[in-house]
A protein has these predicted regions:
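Conserved alpha/beta-domain cores
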Residues: 1-315
């Protein structure tokens, strides 16, 4: 959902939320974003025509949204009633030495539950609105919590989601159901997937981050040395394009098995660039995953690979 916030009509409200110093200020800024998010989600539900829709909550660190241009900083300070000096201090406080492993994903919702509350409200209200217009469509929102590494972490965020969603659904007099799941992208989440499945109704294996955290190198920096690894036959392929079945794949298989032990009907899939790689799709089919998610231009390849894997399985 984070890509929705960068457009001009919404980045200001997002920045107001980030530099807010009280929950009241944050909620005021989030109230500006909620109808915008709802409209976006309604458009998604309309485009999908009743097909399953999974919406991931805010994932990246907040510093990615704050202004860096002095003119933008001065403008935001004026709108917020702050001095430029104070706003610069707030922006500096958001700096992280390792943002990939920092204050992002579900950690944002633990720190600022009002973010999860706003996004949940937008998701549920959008689904109810489209459902009222399209009664023949079976719309069951799937809300995905990113970067979970601990069962209690997901339980906390899920409690915020449930409280918000149930209230809206009850007030609407609706019988609509929804699902809450998580991304498995931290090795600890894969290792404790049986516990996490007590709270999660579905897993989506975020193979981009899971690969980074399992290998211990950043996708953004790995280009500096991976070529040498290919030349010396240490790695035969880019682990960010083709799933490393021996390491990352083993974690995925383990987590899938553990998740099914706790919740036999759990929905399992992967999302990431590897989802468009034929060998990765075949591996996912083999271990019982039910779907892959990938960038649009990789979809035809993924669909073909899924069909080939299914045919091979029948032979």
């Amino acid at each position: 959902t984070e890509h929705m916030f960068f457009e001009a009509d919404r980045i200001k409200a997002m920045r107001e939320m980030i530099v807010s110093e009280t929950s009241e200020q944050r909620e005021k800024a989030l109230a500006k974003l909620e109808p915008i998010q709802q409209a976006d989600f309604e458009a998604i539900y309309e485009a999908m025509k009743g097909r399953p829709v999974t919406i991931r909550l805010l994932d990246p660190p907040l510093h990615e949204f704050v202004p860096t241009d002095p003119k933008d900083i001065a403008e935001l300070a004026k709108e917020m009633g702050l001095t430029v000096e104070h706003l610069n201090q707030v922006i500096s406080s958001l700096h992280e030495f390792n943002p990939m492993m920092g204050h992002r994903g579900c950690r944002l919702d633990v720190t600022f539950p009002e973010i999860a509350k706003m996004q949940t409200a937008a998701i549920i209200k959008a689904a109810l609105a489209v459902r009222s217009r399209r009664p023949a469509w079976k719309i069951v929102p799937e809300i995905m919590v990113p970067l979970v590494g601990e069962e209690k972490e997901l339980a906390f965020v899920k409690s915020v989601i449930d409280k918000t969603a149930r209230k809206i659904i009850k007030e609407a007099g609706s019988d609509m159901t929804y699902k809450v799941g998580t991304m498995i992208e931290i090795p600890r989440a894969a290792l404790t997937a049986d516990a996490i499945a007590k709270e999660a109704e579905f897993f989506s294996f975020g193979t981009n981050d899971l690969t980074q955290m399992t290998f211990g190198f950043s996708r953004d920096d790995a280009g500096k040395f991976l070529a040498s690894y290919y030349d010396r036959k240490i790695y035969e392929s880019d682990p960010f394009s083709k799933l490393d079945q021996a390491g990352v794949g083993r974690l995925v298989k383990m987590a899938a098995e553990l998740g099914r032990e706790t919740r036999p009907d759990i929905k399992l899939g992967i999302c990431g660039e590897q989802g468009g790689d034929p060998s990765t799709v075949a591996f996912c089919h083999k271990i019982g995953l039910t779907y892959v998610s990938c960038s649009p231009f990789r979809v035809p390849i993924a669909r073909l690979a899924a069909a080939q894997a299914a045919i091979k399985d029948e032979q």
